[in-house]
Each structure stands twice: as structure tokens, then as C-alpha cells.
């Protein structure tokens, strides 16, 4: 009996080797639900585009709201358009599922199966297959996967099979760090069989990062960027805008520069991490819980 790729007991959606993304730098962004992954992903994509890179952002959440600050609307999902043509992919055109957003960022929403049915990994796989068939990924410099919540099951871990670096968005609180630790463990498991490696933590919605840094020191993780809890960031979502389109202010300029700095660092290449995720009890003890 063949051993599952990620160890005994795992249930995985395995990648077709033909779907490997050869030329672009690929990043998968994870984090606790509601932590601001879509805001982070969209502004990071915008920052890459500001550096002159050709960017594709793929939303991997049934809510399909990953790219709406880039496109100013909720675009149809890949699963929606596939259902409309009864899964006859030859009937689809690029413009049916790829939408140009802010500063030329190409936006795709994979969507997901109805609640309680199907597999999100299948949908992500079909999305990548369509993009490959229509040569969208061949023309990209950067691909950003924005992945559902902190779900790292075999299905929603599928983007890790394509990614070069996995990034974790976290706030300076227990729940975020607990989720980040679990995600790091899942990424380490994938790294045994795929090219993906941990890149680090993006601190978000946090005045300070002291708890994140305590976790980093213990686990071997690192903070790549820090975005404070600013009202302008919240308002940008309400305005359906990236941070690069908001009314100028000194605090906004600082956040924009941090996104540009992060994009440049990721493009130049961040060293892979070999972190040591903590057991659950250690997280409680580390952050001061009895």
C-alpha cells in the first residue's frame, strides 16, 4: 500500500505535474479567519504591480471576496463559470474568469463547492489548470494565492503544492499565533514533498508585535512586515480600494512603503525558514495562560 505523500493518515489532493507553475514567483498566504488576509494579499499584489511586475492573484475562498478591492466588485468564480457551461472548459474564454484590476493585476476567484459538499482543493486545481491552458501563468511574474482561513486540510493546502514561499498573516494575540503555529506545522509537512518553504509572518492589525516576537524566538519564525491597526486600512475595504488609491496622509504613506518594502524583499528572495512548531500546551505556556 502506497504511503500518503504527507504521512500516514493524510488525505491529499495531489498535484498533476503538468500544472506546475514554472516561471513566476508563487506565494501562498494563510492565517486565521478574519485576520485580514485578503486586504494583505490585495495590497501586496498592488505593491508588486507598482514594482513593475505582472501579477495574478487567485482567491481560494468560497466567499470570493479576495480581489474586490482590486476589481471594485465581486467577480464570478471559476466554479460558477464552469457550472454555467456544464464543465465544458473548451467553451470558456479568458475574460469569463480572469478580470483586470488595479494597476493591471489579473484577478481570479476560484470559489468553492456548496457548503458540505465537494473539495476546495479540486476547485483550486481546476483554476490553475484553466490558467495554464489559457497561458495566463506563463506571462506572470508573481502569483499570489489568498487561501481560506486557517484551513490546512488536503484540499485547501493545495496552493502549497504550487508555492515557493508560504506566508502567515497574524495579529499580536493568542488566537492568531495559535493558528499561525498550526499553519506552520502544515507547511513543514508539505515541505517534505514539495518546493514550498516557510517565508515568515506578516504582522497585521497590531500596534505592537511583542507576542509575535516571543513566538518567533521560540519557534524559529520571523516577522517579514508589520502593518498597524489603522482606520485608513479598514476604510479602504469599505471604499473598495487598495491602500495605494486612498487619500494621501503621512500614516498611509508609511503603510504603502511597508508594502513596497515587503514586495521588494519577496521578489529578491527571502531565506526559507526551518521552524519548529510548538505543541498546543507550549503556546498556552508561552503566552502566559495557566
Swiss-Prot record:
Enzyme Commission number: 1.3.7.7
Annotated metabolic or biological route of this protein: Porphyrin-containing compound metabolism; bacteriochlorophyll biosynthesis (light-independent)
One record GO biological process: photosynthesis, dark reaction
GO molecular function, one term: oxidoreductase activity, acting on the CH-CH group of donors, iron-sulfur protein as acceptor
InterPro entries for this protein: NifH/chlL_CS (IPR030655), NifH/frxC (IPR000392), P-loop_NTPase (IPR027417), Protochlorophyllide_ATP-bd (IPR005971)
Catalytic activity: chlorophyllide a + oxidized 2[4Fe-4S]-[ferredoxin] + 2 ADP + 2 phosphate = protochlorophyllide a + reduced 2[4Fe-4S]-[ferredoxin] + 2 ATP + 2 H2O
Coiled-coil ranges (or none): none
Keyword annotations of the record: 4Fe-4S, ATP-binding, Bacteriochlorophyll biosynthesis, Chlorophyll biosynthesis, Iron, Iron-sulfur, Magnesium, Metal-binding, Nucleotide-binding, Oxidoreductase, Photosynthesis
Protein's UniProt keywords contain Iron: yes
Keyword Transport attributed: no
Record family assignment: Belongs to the NifH/BchL/ChlL family.
Description of how the protein assembles with itself and partners: Homodimer. Protochlorophyllide reductase is composed of three subunits; BchL, BchN and BchB.
Function noted in UniProt: Component of the dark-operative protochlorophyllide reductase (DPOR) that uses Mg-ATP and reduced ferredoxin to reduce ring D of protochlorophyllide (Pchlide) to form chlorophyllide a (Chlide). This reaction is light-independent. The L component serves as a unique electron donor to the NB-component of the complex, and binds Mg-ATP.
Name of this chain's protein: Light-independent protochlorophyllide reductase iron-sulfur ATP-binding protein
Organism this protein belongs to: Rhodospirillum rubrum
Gene designation: bchL
Amino acid at each position: 500500500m502506497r504511503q500518503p505523500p504527507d504521512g500516514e493518515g493524510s488525505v491529499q489532493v495531489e498535484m498533476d505535474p503538468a500544472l506546475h507553475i514554472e516561471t513566476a514567483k508563487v506565494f501562498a498566504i494563510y492565517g486565521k479567519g478574519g485576520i485580514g488576509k485578503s486586504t494583505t494579499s490585495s495590497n501586496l499584489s498592488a505593491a508588486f504591480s507598482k514594482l513593475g511586475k505582472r501579477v495574478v492573484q487567485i482567491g481560494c475562498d468560497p466567499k470570493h471576496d479576495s480581489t474586490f478591492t482590486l476589481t471594485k466588485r465581486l467577480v464570478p468564480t471559476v466554479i460558477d463559470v464552469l457550472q454555467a457551461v456544464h464543465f465544458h472548459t473548451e467553451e470558456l474564454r479568458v475574460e469569463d474568469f480572469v478580470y483586470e484590476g488595479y494597476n493591471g493585476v489579473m484577478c481570479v476567484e476560484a470559489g468553492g463547492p456548496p457548503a458540505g459538499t465537494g473539495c476546495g482543493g479540486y476547485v483550486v486545481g481546476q483554476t490553475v489548470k484553466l490558467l495554464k491552458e489559457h497561458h495566463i501563468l506563463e506571462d506572470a511574474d508573481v502569483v499570489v494565492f489568498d487561501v481560506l482561513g486557517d484551513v490546512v486540510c488536503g484540499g485547501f493546502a493545495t496552493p502549497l503544492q504550487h508555492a515557493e514561499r508560504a506566508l502567515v498573516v497574524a495579529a499580536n494575540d493568542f488566537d492568531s499565533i495559535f493558528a499561525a503555529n498550526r499553519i506552520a506545522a502544515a507547511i513543514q509537512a508539505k515541505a517534505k514533498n514539495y518546493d514550498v518553504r516557510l517565508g515568515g509572518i506578516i504582522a497585521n492589525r497590531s500596534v505592537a508585535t511583542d507576542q509575535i516576537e516571543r513566538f518567533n524566538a521560540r519557534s524559529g519564525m520571523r516577522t517579514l512586515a508589520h502593518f498597524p491597526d489603522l482606520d485608513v486600512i479598514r476604510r479602504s475595504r469599505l471604499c473598495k480600494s487598495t491602500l495605494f488609491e486612498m487619500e494621501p496622509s503621512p500614516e498611509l504613506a508609511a503603510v504603502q512603503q511597508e508594502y513596497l518594502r515587503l514586495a521588494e524583499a519577496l521578489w529578491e528572495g527571502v531565506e526559507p525558514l526551518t521552524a519548529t512548531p510548538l505543541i498546543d500546551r507550549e503556546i498556552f505556556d508561552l503566552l502566559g495562560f495557566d
